[in-house]
């Protein structure tokens, strides 16, 4: 089983997955978890990943281009298009049953952690297969939901 996590905070994600059951599962080779710093896929020297929404709207969203380049890099390494989940408050609610269904269907997943007001809709339309929510509340980013899902999946 492999999970790739696209995030602005890979160190935080790694810290939450370096010990306990997940850490042991990684050490024993039961699960491969790779974090990807989205800023590494920018083309500007400031490594900026946010911008105003295409077509207008309030706040800033994560730009489509660095997200797409990161996603494409993961798919190229895998040699195929990988099922991609955006951790979103608008998605279907994550339950044990949802985790079981995804585990039965996919050996490799990409989890996308959003920030700001969300992710550019063009990236969602082009690359994301489904959106998953951990509940009816707002967090500062998608890292905690991604780690929660990973714990469910690896347990």
Tell me the role of every PLM-derived stretch.
Residues 117-124:
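Short, glycine/polar-rich helix-capping loops at beta-to-alpha or helix-loop-helix junctions
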């Amino acid at each position: 089983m492999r999970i790739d996590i696209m995030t602005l905070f890979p160190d935080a994600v790694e810290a939450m997955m370096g010990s306990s059951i997940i850490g042991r599962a990684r050490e024993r080779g039961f699960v491969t978890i790779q974090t990807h710093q989205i800023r590494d896929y920018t083309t500007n020297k400031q490594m900026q990943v946010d911008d105003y929404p295409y077509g207008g709207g309030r706040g800033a969203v994560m730009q489509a281009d660095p997200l797409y380049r990161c996603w494409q890099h993961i798919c190229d390494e895998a040699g195929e298009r990988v099922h991609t989940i955006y951790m979103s408050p608008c998605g279907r609610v994550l339950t044990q049953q949802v985790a079981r269904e995804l585990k039965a269907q996919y050996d490799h997943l990409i989890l996308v952690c959003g920030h700001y007001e969300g992710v550019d809709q063009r990236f969602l339309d082009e690359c994301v297969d489904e959106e998953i929510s951990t509940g009816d509340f707002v967090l500062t980013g998608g890292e905690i939901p991604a780690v929660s899902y990973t714990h469910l999946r690896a347990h």
